[in-house]
Swiss-Prot record:
Spans traversing the lipid bilayer: none
Pfam families: Ribosomal_S13 (PF00416)
Lineage top rank: taxon: Bacteria
Gene: rpsM
Lineage: Bacteria, Bacillati, Bacillota, Clostridia, Eubacteriales
GO process annotations (BP): translation
Official protein name in the record: Small ribosomal subunit protein uS13
Organism of this sequence: Clostridium botulinum (strain Loch Maree / Type A3)
Amino acid sequence: MARISGIDLPKEKRVEIGLTYIYGIGLPTSQEILEATGVNPDTRVKDLSEEEVNAIRDYVNKNVKVEGDLRREIKLNIKRLVEIGSYRGIRHRRNLPVRGQKTKTNARTRKGPKRAIGGKKKK
């Protein structure tokens, strides 16, 4: 079983798809990695030789931010936006959509469940 960046890649999948199980690697990045290391994208993960796995592992460690490092960087970027008080930072702090979506009717995922507003009862 190939283990790259602390993630066990699924054995039966093609290498191209298997690499996408690592946080921070999508299909284009996966294809770039395989092209740079000279590994055939159609090879199954279980059929990879130890040299190919090591080549992929070395390339990922040197050239791609993945898993914990990437998550940490994203978290720090959001924290910086909140601290400097930018519009995006304020939206993050209030748990509202950050990218300009309307919030009058939608944005339920970001805002959470509806809260009932208590009002006067009619007699």
